A protein has these predicted regions:
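Catalytic cores of alpha/beta
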Residues: 24-32, 55, 69-85
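Glycine/small-residue-rich loop that forms an oxyanion/phosphate-binding "nest" at active or ligand-binding sites
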Residues: 1-23, 32-34
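C-terminal helical cap(s) of enzyme catalytic domains, especially alpha/beta-barrels
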Residues: 9-11, 95-121
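Generic hydrophobic/aromatic pocket-lining and core-packing "Φ" positions
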Residues: 6, 26, 51, 74-75, ...
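Glycine-rich beta-to-alpha transition loops that act as phosphate-gripper elements at the mouths
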Residues: 1-2, 18-23, 42-45, 64-71
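Hydrophobic faces of well-ordered beta-strands that scaffold small-molecule active sites
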Residues: 16-19, 37-39, 62-67, 84-88
Length: 121
């Protein structure tokens, strides 16, 4: 995330979830009024430990961690109070999408939603 990119995105009506990897970038985003951020690459920059450390320092800031998250680790992230959602390529593997196998994508998405205890019906 850069301030210039954020300013351009915020000037539109498009959804914008900037990516951050450091506390300094979180501070910049917060100063711009952005309180929902993508943490990427989550596992490489500290993962769960980083998000736990950021929670008390940045109250009111929520994260969507991506990068290195898989079906096995997603529940640990979703248990954190500052993580309402996670992202991961396991929900839509490249080869499954390329094959147009939307039933498998749907099944994987339903399994992912169940990890967070969300009703998919």
């Amino acid at each position: 995330m850069t301030p210039e990119l954020a300013a351009a995105a915020l000037a539109t009506e498009l959804p914008y979830i900037p990516g951050v990897a450091t506390p300094s970038e979180v501070m910049t985003a917060r100063d711009l009024g952005i309180s929902f951020l993508k943490l990427f690459p989550a596992e490489a920059v500290g993962g769960l430990a980083l998000l736990q450390a950021l929670a008390p320092v940045f109250p009111g800031v929520a994260f969507c961690p991506t990068g290195g998250i898989d079906e096995r680790s997603a529940a640990n992230y979703l248990a954190l109070p500052n993580v309402p959602i996670v992202g991961g390529s396991w929900m839509a593997p490249r080869e499954v999408v390329a094959a147009g196998d939307w039933a498998t994508v749907r099944s994987l998405a339903e399994r992912a939603a169940a990890i967070g205890g969300r009703n998919t019906a």
